[in-house]
Each structure stands twice: as C-alpha cells, then as structure tokens.
C-alpha cells in the first residue's frame, strides 16, 4: 500500500492479564507487542522511496498505561493527526499515572507539529485521575476533539483556550461537575483538587439561619467529608471560548460518541444542552440529583437535598442555568458563523 497516509490500530475494548475462553480480552503484553511491531513497520516503510509517509494515527482502545520511550518515539514519528480512545485496565477506574503521562510526556512529544488531536475516554480527566494540560502548546493545532472530558475547575479548561490556532473545536458529551460528595480516604488517595469549591453545611445545620451562606465555606485542606458545590457554568465557558479563540470557525457541543463523530453512525436526537452537568457521589457520575426527589428514577443519596430550596441544591439546576447557557452558546455559534462568512 504505497499511498497509505492513515493507520488505525484497533484493540479490544477489554483489558485483562489473562486470555479467557469465549471473551475478547487483550492482555497488556499483547497490546505492547502489537504496537512494537507496528512502530517497526512504520520505520521500515520510511526507507522505501516509493511509499508515502503515514501522518495520521488512530489508537482505538489504547490501554491507559505509559509507553516505553523508544516505542512512543517510533510510533509517533511524523504523525501530525493523532486520535486516541482510551480504555481502562479490567474495566476499572482511570489511572493517575496515565493522565500525568498523557499531559507531560506523550502529548508534548508531538505538540510541535500536531494539526489534529482527538482524546476520548469514559468520564476522564477529573476524578479519580486529573488531566490538566497546563503548559501544553500546540502551535499548529487546527482541530481539537474531546469526548467525555469532565471538568472540575476552570484551570482544567484553560489549556484549550491557549491554543489560539484552533479552527475546529468539538466538545462531545463533556460535562462540568457542579456537586461532589467527598468521601475519605478516597479523595485524599486520589489527590482530588476542589480549589474554588464551597463546602455545603452538614444536614444538621439550621438552613434557616439568616447569616448562613454557602459561599462562606472555602475549600479546606485536607477536604472534609461532605457535599461541595461548584459555581462554574457552561455560559462562562462558552464566553471564554468566544473571546479567546479568535480563529475558531466550527464549534460542536452535544452528546455524541466515537461511533457517531468518528465512525459515521447517526447522531442521537437530543438538545445540544442535554446532560451538560454532572454530580459525583459514592464513586459514580450522574445527573439524577438535578431532578426533584419524587421524579428520581432510582434510589440515590438524596436525603441531603430533600430540604426544599436549600442553598446550593442541585435540584432544578438544569432549568435555572438553561437561559444563560443557551444564550452564550448561541452567541458563540453566531460568532463562528460570522468568521466563516468573512472568508
């Protein structure tokens, strides 16, 4: 295939150290051997004058483990379009080591010449492993796609706003976390950063006290167990995108998966602002705490928010934030359309 310019490496979505009968598990060792063979093939191909250079690489279901330096360098040499969908070992939670490796080693190694970048995973980037691209610079990046990137704080998103060359930005099924139930020692073990969040009072606190304000509870070190809330909203984020990315011409914000935007399956029929916020409690992400208690589809940790109109409640947040979020999104979309029309 002398004219090949794109290569997709598709692994099993299931990671396990053992090959179990009747299952499509793929051990880490086999995955690394596969990548090693592919990287060698790519280097051998470069010595053939009649063969094109492969510049686009798709790593579908890449296991969340660091690559050996030589393997990484050989695999990513000449790549300017990189698309990664991460899978977690044995279906477990994401590893902090890989999030750090991604931001400090893998991405910087290709940052100078990368034109397109896609990162997808399952509720990745915040708890239990934070991805923060602070300091990342992609001077040639024109297109960035993130799927299920979970945002705890504004500074987690600032690295995106610093890529001033972006023309296309796709945020698929990305969420801002508004409420979080801190449980110890898990949060200390995970080193969760809730800087800027406010701790809500214990249930026993008198909610009717005139001097009470949820804004008066600063982030504590270490985090005390209990509920915390975050004031960050998508309206703020949309405004910052519009103000900080002057070349942006195409922006997508909707619930969508890899199969839709990358493999061409029909998009789900839902509102662009559908499920844009998340809560975190008892080790899982969700949106049901935004619903009234009598409409909740399953048993949840709801007793805390059953006091009607209590300060900081997530109940009704989707409805309360919808006008500002929609206006900011429409203003951003109008700005991108205007830029396209001016060309």
Give the location of each predicted region.
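Leucine-rich repeat
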Residues: 1-139, 153-158
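Leucine-rich solenoid repeat modules
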Residues: 139-343
